């Protein structure tokens, strides 16, 4: 069964928080989209799915580079076949 790692781009606080506009924060949108995508993929029964953030307040890494490195290392350690990184703009 293919393994799909879904990276909900950005952190909720501190550094690497993403874009903001129209009353929305990128990290909140990517978190919600990632959770919904994971639900749909799991429901199909055809994929194993892992999310980069399991709670909306989870912060990964301690710098921009550290955050990205942690996400990639987690996906590779898990043996992901696919890495989907979610981002938004406007």
Regions found by a protein language model. Name each.
Residues 2-90:
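Catalytic-core regions of hydrolytic enzymes
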């Amino acid at each position: 069964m293919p393994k799909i790692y879904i990276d909900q781009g950005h952190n909720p606080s501190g550094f690497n928080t993403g874009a903001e506009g129209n009353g929305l924060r990128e990290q909140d949108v990517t978190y919600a989209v990632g959770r919904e995508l994971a639900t749909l993929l799991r429901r199909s029964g055809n994929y194993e799915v892992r999310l980069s953030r399991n709670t909306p307040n989870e912060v990964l890494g301690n710098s921009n580079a550290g955050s990205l490195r942690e996400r990639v290392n987690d996906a590779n350690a898990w043996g992901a076949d696919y890495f989907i990184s979610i981002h938004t703009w406007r």
